[in-house]
Structure formats: structure tokens, C-alpha cells
UniProtKB/Swiss-Prot annotation:
This is Sulfate adenylyltransferase subunit 2. With CysN forms the ATP sulfurylase (ATPS) that catalyzes the adenylation of sulfate producing adenosine 5'-phosphosulfate (APS) and diphosphate, the first enzymatic step in sulfur assimilation pathway. APS synthesis involves the formation of a high-energy phosphoric-sulfuric acid anhydride bond driven by GTP hydrolysis by CysN coupled to ATP hydrolysis by CysD. It comes from Trichlorobacter lovleyi (strain ATCC BAA-1151 / DSM 17278 / SZ). It holds the Pfam family PAPS_reduct. GO terms for molecular function: ATP binding; sulfate adenylyltransferase (ATP) activity. Keywords: ATP-binding, Nucleotide-binding, Nucleotidyltransferase, Transferase. Its EC number is 2.7.7.4. SUPFAM superfamilies: Adenine nucleotide alpha hydrolases-like (SSF52402). Heterodimer composed of CysD, the smaller subunit, and CysN. InterPro entries: PAPS_reduct_dom (IPR002500), Rossmann-like_a/b/a_fold (IPR014729), SO4_adenylTrfase_ssu (IPR011784), Sulfate_adenylyltrnsfr_sub2 (IPR050128). It comes from the Bacteria.
Length: 301
């Protein structure tokens, strides 16, 4: 498969510059590792940025306890293989209250297990900068967010109070207690990510590749039967379908797509033809109008 990769090297260079800028300017950075394709690319870029040395910052995963099992095993494998320090934080208060996406709905569940969990971890370890894998092409609130996204002492984001970013100059100054969310992949597209994964042969979670999987159709989405906690509702039936995931999150809130794309070239070809957003499969984005922006103002990724 022939691909003109010149633009990918430009994106790679920009991302590496951003990662190095944070490490040189911030006192205690961390890389948020959500285990998805974007996190895998970001991890790969971090390794390149400081090669042959190991990056000086740890990885951190906010574990909701509802991730796909394959994601958790892949997370542990990558951390061990590359020798990263891996911090795993769970909002134990939410676990003790029995918060789940089935009982409490996606909005409350996301707020407690993801947003509050992230805020707890950032405060606990006193990180002043956190790398994230968000991209501007994913969603409209992310489209207007700066590469260096400044958060208050309460971790909130004010979209009307963002600093200018001129050329490749970034202002990393923060007051005590504040922090920065930094998005090295801001200017990448979904297609760029897949082409770069193909070019660099970056390992990713097998859930991205199509194969026969047990799914149930719920709320117009194909939900993978990942463990025994997913109870069938009246009228639902488990079906074996050739599916894969364009985006990965908590399995009860992430819809698969029917696909036969089982290799990277096939996925890239599928991306060239698609006319829908990858986040159409994320139930949390459908909570209400502007739900992602509201979540980010409250401290979400």
C-alpha cells in the first residue's frame, strides 16, 4: 500500500515539539493513557521524543472498572514492554456507591467515574500538566480548544478565556493549583492517526480490527457482550456479527460498527469512504446538546 507520508512527518515533528516543550517547562507532567489508538500514537511519539532515553513522566489511566477486558490486558502489556511507570486511579467513592452505566445513566456515571476520578488523581499527585490524545476533528468543543488548555484550580475549562497560540510558541505559565491539559494530536485527523499507525507499525488494541463478536442491539448501537454484568433486556438477543470499534471507551457506552476491515490497509480504505464521525459510537456524546463542552468545563478530559 503506497501512501504519501510527508504531512505525517510534519505532524509528527509538531507533536514531538509540544511534548518536549511541556517536559522542559512544567515541573510534574503526566501522560493520560486511555489505551485507544490516539493514546498509542501519543505514547509512540513520547518514546521518539526522548529516544534512547525513557520519557521522564509516568502514564496514568483513569480506570472506571468498565473498560473492555482486552483494553486492560493491552494497557498492562504496553506499560511492561516499554518500562513506563503506570499509575491506575479508580474513584473508590464511586465504586463503593455502586455507580454503573446501567443503573445511573451515562451522564452521572461519566461525571463520577471519569471526571471526578481524573480530578482526584491530578490533585493527589499534584500534576501541573497532563497530555491527552484528543483531536480537533473529533467533536465541536474540541475543535475550538487550544493545544495548551488551561484549567482552574478546580480543573474547570473556560472556553471564553483561552490564550493565543502564535506559530509554535506556547505560554505554559500557571498559578499554583492550576494545571494544563496538553493535546499533541490536536491537528491530526482520524485518517492521519491510522496512516501513522500503519507507517510506524504501532501496536493497538485488537478491538479495532473486525472479527465475529457477540453483540446486542441497544439504543440503536451494537454493544459488545464483554462480561456477565451486561444483562439482556426483554426482546434483546445476542448476535454474532463481524464488527470492530472506531473509538474505545467503557464497553456499555461504546457502540461497534459492522465491518470486515481486519487489517490496517482495510481500515484506512474504510476511513477514506466513511461520512460519519468516529464518536457517533460514544453514548456519552449524546447526553444533551453541548454535552462534551459542559463536561470539559466541569473537568473532563
Amino acid at each position: 500500500m503506497y501512501l504519501n507520508m510527508t504531512h505525517l512527518r510534519q505532524l509528527e515533528s509538531e507533536s514531538i515539539h509540544i511534548i518536549r516543550e511541556v517536559v522542559s517547562e512544567c515541573e510534574n507532567p503526566v501522560m493520560l493513557y486511555s489505551i485507544g489508538k490516539d493514546s498509542s500514537v501519543m505514547l509512540h511519539l513520547a518514546l521518539k521524543a526522548f529516544y534512547p532515553a525513557k520519557p521522564s513522566f509516568p502514564l496514568m489511566h483513569i480506570d472506571t472498572t468498565w473498560k473492555f477486558r482486552e483494553m486492560i490486558s493491552f494497557r498492562d502489556q504496553m506499560a511492561s514492554e516499554y518500562g513506563f511507570d503506570l499509575l491506575v486511579h479508580i474513584n473508590q467513592d464511586g465504586v463503593d456507591q455502586g455507580i454503573s452505566p446501567f443503573k445511573h445513566g451515562s451522564a452521572l456515571y461519566t461525571d463520577i467515574m471519569k471526571t471526578e476520578g481524573l480530578k482526584q488523581a491530578l490533585s493527589k499527585y499534584k500534576f501541573d500538566a497532563a497530555f491527552g490524545g484528543a483531536r480537533r476533528d473529533e467533536e465541536k468543543s474540541r475543535a475550538k480548544e487550544r493545544i495548551f488548555s488551561f484549567r482552574s484550580a478546580n480543573h474547570g475549562w473556560d472556553p471564553k478565556n483561552q490564550r493565543p497560540e502564535l506559530w509554535n510558541l506556547y505560554n505554559t505559565r500557571v498559578n499554583p493549583g492550576e494545571n494544563i491539559r496538553v493535546f499533541p494530536l490536536s491537528n491530526w485527523t482520524e485518517l492521519d492517526v491510522w496512516q501513522y499507525i500503519y507507517l510506524e507499525q504501532i501496536p493497538i488494541v485488537p478491538l479495532y480490527f473486525a472479527k465475529q463478536r457477540p453483540v446486542v442491539k441497544r439504543n440503536g448501537m451494537l454493544i459488545l457482550l464483554d462480561d456477565e454484568r451486561l444483562k439482556l433486556q426483554p426482546g434483546e438477543q445476542v448476535q454474532m456479527k463481524p464488527v470492530r470499534f472506531r473509538t474505545l471507551g467503557c464497553y456499555p457506552l461504546t457502540g461497534a460498527i459492522e465491518s470486515t476491515a481486519a487489517t490496517l490497509p482495510e481500515i484506512i480504505q474504510e476511513m477514506l469512504l466513511t461520512r460519519t464521525s468516529e464518536r457517533q459510537g460514544r453514548l456519552i456524546d449524546h447526553d444533551q446538546a453541548g454535552s462534551m463542552e459542559k463536561k470539559k468545563q466541569e473537568g473532563y478530559f
